[in-house]
Amino acid sequence: MEQSNDSLRVNHNDGEESKTSAQVFEHLICMDSRDSSFGQNDSPTVLPITTREANNSLISQNIPGPLTQTQTLSAEQFHLVDQNGQAIQYELQSLGESNAQMMIVASPTENGQVLRVIPPTQTGMAQVIIPQGQLVDVNSPRDVPEEKPSNRNLPTVRVDTLADNTSNYILHPQTSFPLPKKSVTGMLEEPLLGPLQPLSSNTPIWACRLRSCEKIGDSYRGYCVSETELESVLTFHKQQTQSVWGTRQSPSPAKPATRLMWKSQYVPYDGIPFVNAGSRAVVMECQYGPRRKGFQLKKVSEQESRSCQLYKATCPARIYIKKVQKFPEYRVPTDPKIDKKIIRMEQEKAFNMLKKNLVDAGGVLRWYVQLPTQQAHQYHELETPCLTLSPSPFPVSSLEEEETAVRDENCALPSRLHPQVAHKIQELVSQGIEQVYAVRKQLRKFVERELFKPDEVPERHNLSFFPTVNDIKNHIHEVQKSLRNGDTVYNSEIIPATLQWTTDSGNILKETMTVTFAEGNSPGESITTKVETNQTRGSLSPEPTHLLSSLSSFQPKIFTQLQGLQLQPRYTSPDESPAVVSVNNQPSSSPSGLLDTIGSAVMNNNSLLLGQSHSLQRDTCLTQNNSTASTMGNLPEPDQNLVAMDELVEVGDVEDTGNLEGTVHRILLGDVQTIPIQIIDNHSALIEENPESTISVSQVKQEPKEPALSMEAKKTVDYKKLSAT
């Protein structure tokens, strides 16, 4: 008998008085609510299953056919048929000289007919087991017992009185109501339901003890119906996993909750409404989990921050326990084939009925528990159990082995996260997004919009796709450590076309990098760098942004990114002033032309362009507005490169400069990508061509109010102050 579709129908008819005494007989009929005859007043075909006689004789009845009031009956009669209309055979035997009777019910199975013997503890109680295993207790009007025998594996339903003048009743499964002249107290006990999804053969023993158990990531979730059962499962889980737990959060003794819900973060949807019993869930953390931020730990944290100690990753394993009160009698169908509009209407109807009768609704208590496996523990070693309860308590299935192999291949970090989620964290950190809540926001968008379809998004409590703040902190730390060690190689394909940094409020933050190169002691030494940031109105193209964002993590990697761009110790001019830019292998060109163009570009805060095989023309415009445009126009398109593979570029410190403080210059790479270089000190530059075909830039004084050097002024510069390097 399906619990959601079948119902019990009780017909109450006033029988004629017999010669011995006036008796009332009733018919208890089990019918399928989907039957066309359901709800009609005509008498269906029934089978009497219990009869109490005045004498102690053995009675065996199997009476098909309708019962009428003309039949002479000396006792109450209850009739039961299954959903197919088939009669159920039974035998009722008396025990000794008392009125106590024993019910024997036959139910067919695959292996034949099975007899169930149910001895009642008190007289006047008849117990019937219907074939589907539902236990129905009906009390006699003369003796109302407070306790009843029941099978712990079967649900129990009692019948209570509704009204004396009622003739027909509909009893839904797990619903209690009274019959005339029947005084009953109702109690509902839940059956041990099967798992929502099939569990593998290697499911831990402690997980099999949970009702409606299902696997979520590296945890198992189910529920218990009593505190004793809950404590038993928790104790068995601790013994099996050899783990120690501490309570991080416990529910407060707040006023009873009245908000009706269908599902929550801890309770899956099963078509049964519920209210929370307690304000918060119980959260238990592993002993190697995050440390509490108490008063005594403030000094320790300050010392650690001052000494710049490494971040210590903590175990993310947690146990969640949520106590709720369920109302199974207001269940709605969960069949996915049913129209969603009908289900919503049923939900609204159930909510409205519950709001009116919430105080007297009763319900059952459930403790929903989510227990992690051994794979959920990280950053520490688990103790080996002293006494193994089974040869292989936690065998690893082929599916889990495959998942572990994929995880090890795609992500070098030991993680319970899904490999694509862990890779997304690595990608975000490599792009400069390191704030925990910013990363979590991006991860949620990634999972809900890219990984899954809208109807297939996993629940938020699945930590494989929705990691906790502690998980995100651990991953960010691991990625940063890999970047510092140079273990992580950037993939330019994952960098978006337009990369934008945003502040906490969502505003776009545009910055440029100020790079200062220091001089080495010898020509063979590498040059160290110092990086500063300044806001600007410009934006960077993807490749320079990618390059500069990685510069703060590991500075030596910038040289491998530039490939053909090699940095050498800076050259100096004869008056020992440092040169700004030196380019080798330049073809000979007119000194005045180079002087005019480059001098104008430097002083007008525009891009500095050097061609590999083409020089700048003499007729370059020297105005501030179009100097860069004229320079770009005079260079052929294939040769608009600053530095080629065989060229050497050297950038040195600038000292004692003039009016160029705060100006930004760009060096164009091979694909016309720019690196902004900001000149902090004030100076101006002039250029000459030496016999070795090397262009050097040295310092000269500039008048503060002179916007640019004219063509004639640059030609008349005293070249005696400059010499070849």
Swiss-Prot record:
Q: Give the residues annotated as coiled coil.
A: none
**GO BP:** cellular response to calcium ion; regulation of transcription by RNA polymerase II
Compositional bias (Low complexity): 577-592
Q: Which domain of life is it from?
A: Eukaryota
| Main location (coarse class) | nucleus
Keyword annotations: Activator, DNA-binding, Nucleus, Transcription, Transcription regulation
Per UniProt, subcellular location reads as:
Nucleus
User: Record's GO cellular component, any one?
Assistant: nucleus
Q: What biological function has been recorded for the protein in this entry?
A: Acts as a transcriptional activator that mediates the calcium- and neuron-selective induction of BDNF exon III transcription. Binds to the consensus calcium-response element CaRE1 5'-CTATTTCGAG-3' sequence.
Designated name of the protein = Calcium-responsive transcription factor
The lineage, from the top, is: Eukaryota, Metazoa, Chordata, Craniata, Vertebrata
